[in-house]
Amino acid sequence: HRDLHSFPTRRSSDLLIQNQYQFIAVKFEESEQYRFEKALAQKPFLPEENEEEEVELANHLQTFGLIKRIESLPEQASKVILGISGGLDSALALLVSHQAMKRLGRDPKDIIAVTMPAQATSKNSNSIAKNLMSKLGVTALEIPIAESVDLHLKSIDHDTKDVTYENAQARMRTLILMDLSNKYGGFVLGTGDLSEIALGWMTYNGDQMSMYAVNAGLPKTWVQRLIRYHADHEYHVLKETLEKILQAPISPELLENQDT
């Protein structure tokens, strides 16, 4: 009761304090030729010095972090299950998973990589995803979701291609991955990066949800740089495919011709 009664008093005090502020108008001249005293980096998160060493260190941190996660699980629940779209984030997550299994002396077939094409999935993205999975020798599954999503949307009487339509696809993919983790004895590896997390560019109960988010500490520029690192080093055999991923427009492909 005391808090409720004191609310008007607090409000009056706040207004009194605001009235005591002194406002000073300051004018600035606008100039198109203005230059900052110090140049602003276009990619501020990437190292300016010892770049190769820093990138190699980032790769080790990702790989050994995932190894630690795998080792903490009972063997019958330690397979890696992840969705592959043919984009930057899922490609990096797959490469890190492959490195982790290799260092653990385990069969790459213990990585279950899943493509889940829908109406807006491009042939190029799907082809890239399949090529990656094939060359890495992982267990590759393709589970189309178009019919499942349509059935779900029909059940809630929704026929508009809007945010509901987009999120339904992301949630359907996560549902499939979670069920596969139970079926095959593993955990869902999240692929989203720090830029997406910071901007909220994800679907709750969709790609936001996983048991271990391997890219969560990396902004998109770092993801791109690490893909380049892998193309030039251990995964040189995948260089052509990884180059295609780097050059492709960034898109969630939840709507036709969608970009970011």
Pin down the residues of each PLM region.
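Short, small-residue-biased leader/transition segments that mark boundaries at the very start
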Residues: 1, 5-12
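ATP/NTP-dependent adenylation/nucleotidyl-transfer catalytic domains that generate, transfer
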Residues: 13-86, 90-260
